[in-house]
Amino acid sequence: PASADALARLAGGRACDMLSAQALAFDGPLLVAPAMNPRMWAHAATQDNVATLRRRGVRILAPGNGSTACGDQGQGRLVSSDELLLACLQALAPQDMAGLRVMVTLGPTREPWDGVRFWSNPSSGRMGAALATAAWLRGATVEAVCGPGCPPLPDGVRRHDVRTAREMFEAAQSLWSEMDLGAFSAAVADFSPVPYGEAKFKKEGASDGFSVSFASNPDILRTLSLGRREGQKVLGFAAETAPDMDALMTLVRGKRQRKQADLLAGNAVNAPGCGFGTDSNSMAVLDKNGHEEIWTSQSKADVAWKLWSWLLRV
């Protein structure tokens, strides 16, 4: 980590050791991750050096709060390895989405039936998290509407946690008018059970079985796609089971037409090692101009990157 002395050397333009000499000679993006005693970090001299570096375009990954190596409590802990990695990736990534406002829906929804049971699906939110992260790395301002159990997102992504399809619809609808791009990757329940009530349904009253009625939920993708303003672009997703990728593409063609998405990605959730809860997807992708591609067993991170690049140019 960058010590108080290292910050002083960098701010003063020193070239007295390998680190300061390399930093002074380097004309690319410079990231500095300090860690030190909390009183050293708060000292006016250190803060002046930090301000000087920031004015020169250096990105400072400010230390976190907690117990430091000397045993004192306060701001001085090195940021996590995940934060360091994301900051480095962002510095190296093309900023071709800078200035764009992006909304991503991700994860499942849970439709309650009684006090303990609900209707849902096994979506993990990993595909949507990959989309949100990729857009943020490429410079976009990202709003993520997250169903239950979604993975962590970069601190720079604004997260909106919801539970039901209705809540996801309302959250997405409230954000959509200000967005430039939307990726609707959430596995939203198409139907909700008509609620039994807040109490737990007891099996003793249904020894011969029972029936549950369902009501339709809002179609988030279609509603927001049809209601978009000029210039907005829509990336839709379809979780499907199909015997092969050609059959999946047939399903995608029909769904893209119904949803009026600029780009639609069909996900073969029954493909081995792909789909819900995995790190890979097999996709059939189609845009509004009729261009089609099939991607087999690719990482969700790679899929996310490619989908944004495609949506930008469609």
Language-model regions, residue ranges each:
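Short, acidic/small-residue loops that bind anionic groups at enzyme active sites
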Residues: 10-37, 52-54, 59-61, 207-223
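A glycine- and small/hydrophobic-rich beta-loop-beta segment
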Residues: 147-148, 156-222, 226
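Glycine-rich phosphate/diphosphate-binding loop of Rossmann-like nucleotide-binding domains
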Residues: 47, 51-52, 94-164
